[in-house]
Amino acid sequence: MYKLTRFQYPRDRSVGDSQVLTTEINVAAIELIDAGGRIGLGFAQSLFSVLPDSAEIERIFLEQAWPGLEGKLPSALALAVRRPRGGNVRRMTLPFEEAIQQAVWDLLAQQQGVPLWQMLGAERQSVPAYASGLDFHLSDHAFSELFGNAAEQGYRGFKIKVGHPELERDLHRLNLLRQAVGPERPVMIDPNEAWNAQQAIDALAIFERAGHRIFWVEDPVPRDDIDGLKMIRRLGVTRVNAGEYLDLSGKRRLLEQRACDMLNVHAQVGDVMRAGWLASEHNVEVTLGNSFLEIGVNMALALPGVRWLEYSFQNFDHLVEETFPIRDGMIFGSDRPGHGLRLSAGAEQACRAIAAAGAATAVTAA
């Protein structure tokens, strides 16, 4: 069996980068239910468009996703190796793929009676988290407040969005960040493919002359510019973190070309573990980028040498009964069987309240 739940409500701040901006959350929770009543949970997020109504979401799921799931063992779904060809190499109409992986692996770990991170082979229970602002469109005041609070909470590193048409603005933000968090902890930058290789090299040189040592630059050039990534990497002034926008095959090519120092992965459980194996074969460090409600902590704990997981202060917490604990800049795996997240019984009501409050604020402001 399965259950789908649609959520739509405003964000508590603008979220975006040099390329995109979003002010609303549109999510579908997918619950896969086995014969014993255990529930595997996954989240399908539409970042830039409103999801259709619940009936249409279910129609698409029933037509495109459910035939491949119905009657299958979670272990078979999790471990199967597929090689689609021709017209079968395509995405579903709605972004169900990652959510299905999350739900399947959650259900499999529950059936084994262990936390997912333990089932994946982890020998530690916590990993450092860095504070990520998704801050390109924030005011200077909101930017400084966000990172100042993150520093007080003990986060181990800080990543800001850069790639503004005026490089002076990026430099200004780096100056503000250092004022907010102090001089010692690592700083990362993410232009979200805003530059070409020479622009990235020039920007890094300007930042360095201004006294900013950059721990990594993330996706500095378009994802298919392998030669550009290699140019930046050869300079040796900072680490190149790449791979966020690539599927597993693209990540393999990135590693084979020695085009990154760090491979960025997210929350497709099986794909992340395979990518982690490939990265280990090439002696490349893995970093966990944004994953919905930090579900990626399970893979971060299990993969060798992962030192960083991204935390970006998004208002998702009310959707689940309990989030992953974060203390002194360390995020911990859950002790409960599965990946650790359970949909809150009050999630729909909480989202309606947030949406109503947002509408009231908008009317008042008008």
Regions found by a protein language model. Give the residues of each.
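Catalytic domains of carbohydrate-active enzymes, especially glycoside hydrolases
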Residues: N149-K161
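Active-site beta->alpha loop and helix N-cap motifs at the rims of alpha/beta catalytic domains
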Residues: G133-S144, G163-L167
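Metal- or metallocofactor-binding catalytic centers and their adjacent structured scaffolds
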Residues: I33-Q111
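Flexible C-terminal active-site loop/helix
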Residues: F7-Y9, S291-A366
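N-terminal small/glycine-rich loop or linker at the start of catalytic domains
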Residues: Q112-D135
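Conserved, mostly hydrophobic/aromatic
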Residues: I30, G37, I100, G113, ...
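Structured beta-strand/loop patches that form or line metal/cofactor-binding pockets in enzymes
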Residues: M1-V50, D317
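Catalytic core of soluble alpha/beta enzymes
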Residues: I160, P165-N290, M299, I326
